[in-house]
Regions:
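Alpha-helix capping/termination and helix-coil
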Residues: 211-214, 374-382
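Short, low-complexity, Pro/Ser/Thr/Gly-rich segments in the mature regions of secreted, periplasmic
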Residues: 451-477
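Electrostatic cytochrome c docking/interface patches
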Residues: 339-370, 472-477
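Extracytoplasmic/periplasm-facing segments of secreted or lipoprotein envelope proteins
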Residues: 359-361, 368-374, 455-465
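Sequence context surrounding c-type heme c attachment/ligation sites in exported
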Residues: 314, 318-339, 361-376, 384-398, ...
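C-terminal partner/receptor-binding element of secreted or periplasmic proteins
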Residues: 446-450
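Extracytoplasmic electron-transfer domains, predominantly the class I c-type cytochrome c fold
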Residues: 377, 382-442, 458-464
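Polytopic transmembrane helical bundles with strong interfacial aromatic enrichment
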Residues: 1-350
C-alpha cells in the first residue's frame, strides 16, 4: 500500500460562516439541476411541436416553439451556464477531495460529457440565430441534435453521480465502466428523463399563458398537448422503487425512518410529485382542463420542491460516505482512520488559524483545527447544523463518549479520525463556543480522561456503524 494513502490531502481553507458548506453547494446544485432538466425536456418538447407544425397537426406550433426557446435560451444558456460554473467553483472549495476523485476516475467521461454539452449549445444557438432562415426539415434536424445532445449530457453525468452511491464492482476492479454502469445507473437515468419531460410540460404551460394574442380555446389546446409530457409520471413509482431497491441496505434504511430528516424530504418529494401527477392525469389529460398561469406556476413550484427533496435524499443516503466505501463525507478515507488516530489529523494541516489570538489556550486552538478538518464540511459551529446546538444538550461525559463512538451515536456519521487529545480538544472547543467564548478557559489534560477516550475509540473501532455492517452482511448473504 502506498504510504500516502494514509495521509489526508489538505487543501486551502474556505469558511462560509453560519452557512453550512454542504448547504451552499446543495442549494446551488438544486437550482442548477432544475434548470438543466427543464432544458433537456424542453428540447424534446420543441422537437415534437416542430414536427406537429411541419405535418400540419398544430397551426400554432411555430409560435410556441419560438416562445419556449426564448425562455430556454435565457434560463438554460445563461442562468444554467452560470450556475454550472458555480457548481464547479463551490465543489472544489467545499469538497475538493471528492471532486478530485471523480475527475481522476472519470476524466474521459467528463470530457465526453463536455463534448455533448458543447454540441447542445452550438445546436441551440444555431437554431435560435438561423431558425427563420432554415427549411422546416433543417429546423427539425437541428432540434433533434439539440435534444439528443442534451440527453446525452445527462446520460454521462448520471453515471458519475450514481457511482458515488453504488460504485458496484468498481471497488474491486477500478474499471471505469464497472463504476459508470453501476446498480443505480438505469433507474436513476430513466427517472431523471421522466423529470425532464415533466418540467418541460409545466414550463411550456407557463409560457403558453404568457403568449399574447391567443384565445382561451387555443391556450387550452396547446396546454392539453403539453400535458402529454406529464403522463410519464405514471412510471415514477416503479422507477423510484427500482432505485430504492438498488441502494445499499443501510442507505435504504435512512429513508425508511432511520433518519427523520431524510425520510421527511423523501415524503416531500413523493407528495409533491403525487399532486402534480394527479392533476396532470385527471385534470389535464382525462378532463382536458385549462390551467391559468398562476396554477401552472404553482405546479412548477411543486416540481421544484420535489426536485429539492429528491436531490437532498440522493446526497443524504450516501452517508457516511461521499463515495461509498472509498471516501467518507468529511474527506477522509477508511484506510486513513486508524493511522490518524495514532498521528493525529491536525499535524497534516499546514494552514494556521487566521484568528489564533482569539483562542485563550492552545487546546482550544487545536480544537478549532480539528473542527476544521473533521467537521466543517457538514457542520457549522453555531449556524446551520451547528455543533453547539447538536451537542449542547449532552453532558461533558456524553460529549466525549458520543464523539469517540461517533458512528455508533449517529449511524450516518463517519468514525472519528484523530487522537484522544484531539478529541478532547474539539469537545472543549465546542463547549467554549457554547459558553459564548469566555476570555478564560481551563485546559483539560487529565490522563485518566484521555485514557477513557482512548478506550472508547478502541471500542468503536474504525469501521462504519455496526448496523450498517450488519445490513451489508445480510444483503450479501441474500
Amino acid at each position: 500500500m502506498d504510504p500516502s494513502a494514509y495521509l489526508p490531502a489538505v487543501y486551502p481553507v474556505n469558511d462560509y460562516g453560519p452557512v453550512m458548506k454542504g448547504l451552499a453547494i446543495g442549494g446551488l446544485g438544486i437550482f442548477h439541476v432544475f434548470l438543466a432538466q427543464f432544458a433537456i425536456g424542453g428540447g424534446f418538447l420543441m422537437w415534437w411541436f416542430e414536427w406537429l407544425g411541419i405535418t400540419g397537426r398544430e397551426p400554432l406550433a411555430d409560435r410556441l416553439v419560438g416562445s419556449v426557446f426564448r425562455v430556454l435560451i435565457l434560463l438554460s444558456f445563461v442562468v444554467g451556464a452560470l450556475t454550472g460554473v458555480g457548481m464547479w467553483l463551490t465543489s472544489i472549495q467545499v469538497s475538493p477531495q471528492t471532486i478530485g476523485l471523480m475527475v481522476d476516475e472519470f476524466h474521459w467521461i467528463w470530457a465526453t460529457e463536455w463534448i455533448f454539452f458543447w454540441l447542445e449549445v452550438v445546436a441551440g444557438y444555431a437554431f435560435f440565430r438561423y431558425r427563420d432562415h432554415l427549411a422546416p426539415r433543417a429546423r427539425l434536424a437541428l432540434l433533434a441534435i439539440y435534444s439528443v445532445a442534451g440527453w446525452g449530457s445527462l446520460f454521462w453525468i448520471n453515471g458519475i453521480l450514481s457511482w458515488q452511491l453504488t460504485p458496484g464492482a468498481w471497488t474491486e476492479t477500478h474499471s471505469v465502466w464497472d463504476g459508470f454502469f453501476n446498480p443505480t445507473f438505469w433507474p436513476s437515468l430513466l427517472f431523471r428523463t421522466v423529470v425532464c419531460l415533466v418540467l418541460a410540460g409545466l414550463g411550456a404551460a407557463i409560457v403558453i399563458n404568457a403568449m399574447p394574442g391567443l384565445s382561451r380555446e387555443e391556450r387550452t389546446r396547446l396546454i392539453n398537448r403539453c400535458s402529454l409530457f406529464l403522463l410519464p409520471m405514471l412510471a415514477m413509482p416503479v422507477l423510484g422503487g427500482w432505485f430504492v431497491m438498488a441502494m445499499p441496505a443501510d442507505s435504504r434504511s435512512w429513508i425508511m425512518g432511520g433518519s427523520m430528516t431524510m425520510t421527511m424530504f423523501l415524503n416531500i418529494a413523493a407528495g409533491a410529485s403525487a399532486l402534480i401527477g394527479g392533476y396532470a392525469v385527471i385534470g389535464l389529460w382525462r378532463q382536458r382542463l385549462y390551467i391559468n398561469g398562476a396554477t401552472a406556476t404553482l405546479l412548477a413550484a411543486l416540481a421544484f420542491g420535489a426536485t429539492a427533496g429528491g436531490e437532498f435524499v440522493r446526497e443524504g443516503v450516501r452517508k457516511p460516505y461521499s463515495v461509498r466505501e472509498t471516501l467518507y463525507s468529511n474527506a477522509t478515507t477508511p484506510a486513513q482512520i486508524a493511522s490518524l488516530r495514532e498521528t493525529g489529523v491536525t499535524v497534516h494541516d499546514p494552514y494556521p488559524l487566521r484568528d489564533r489570538a482569539d483562542y485563550p489556550s492552545e487546546q482550544l486552538a487545536l480544537g478549532r483545527l480539528v473542527y476544521r478538518n473533521q467537521c466543517a464540511i457538514c457542520h457549522t459551529v453555531s449556524g446551520t447544523n451547528g455543533l453547539t446546538e447538536l451537542m449542547g444538550g449532552w453532558s461533558l461525559g456524553q460529549q466525549r463518549m458520543n464523539v469517540a463512538k461517533l458512528q455508533w451515536t449517529k449511524g450516518f456519521m463517519p468514525p472519528f479520525a484523530g487522537t484522544p487529545g484531539e478529541l478532547e480538544a474539539v469537545v472543549q472547543y465546542i463547549r467554549w463556543e457554547h459558553a459564548k467564548r469566555p476570555a478564560d478557559w481551563a485546559e483539560s489534560r487529565d490522563p485518566a480522561v484521555l485514557a477513557e477516550i482512548a478506550r472508547w475509540l478502541e471500542e468503536a473501532g474504525t469501521a462504519p456503524a455496526p448496523r450498517a455492517q450488519e445490513l451489508a452482511r445480510e444483503e450479501v448473504s441474500r
